[in-house]
Amino acid sequence: MSVVIRLARAGTKKRPVYHVVVADSRFPRDGRFIERLGHFNPLLPKDSEARLKLDLDKVKAWVAKGAQPSDRVARFLDAAGVKKREARNNPEKAVPRKERKAAAEAAAKK
């Protein structure tokens, strides 16, 4: 059983609120879950304390048991100092394609 810590959408249309839950990875996103760990309201300002509420003791216990956080939850845990998130390295994304690079070099020579 692969256990993940992820966001489950709640709220109404165009007014999302997310529950931070522990669930089996095979369960639907908004379906069954094992335990609720907190909630996240993206509509509140970023500096608001009510934007994200987590029970850090429960989160630490689930991470110790091997639960894998989703990408967004990993960002939350990194900000809270619970689990370090490794920075992504994608150096090829910013490199221009060969044709554009050649065209830019030709334009620079003129």
UniProtKB/Swiss-Prot annotation:
Organism: Rhodopseudomonas palustris (strain BisB18)
Region Disordered, residue ranges: 84-110
Source taxon at top rank: Bacteria
Pfam families, sorted: Ribosomal_S16 (PF00886)
Gene3D superfamilies assigned to the protein according to its UniProt record, in alphabetical order: 3.30.1320.10
Xref: HAMAP family: Ribosomal_bS16
A single BP term in Gene Ontology: translation
GO MF annotations in UniProt: structural constituent of ribosome
Chain's gene name: rpsP
Entry annotated with the keyword Ribosomal protein: yes
GO cellular component, one term: small ribosomal subunit
Protein name (Swiss-Prot/TrEMBL): Small ribosomal subunit protein bS16
Record-stated family: Belongs to the bacterial ribosomal protein bS16 family.
Keyword list, A-Z: Ribonucleoprotein, Ribosomal protein
Family annotation (SUPFAM superfamilies): Ribosomal protein S16 (SSF54565)
Residues passing through the membrane, by range: none
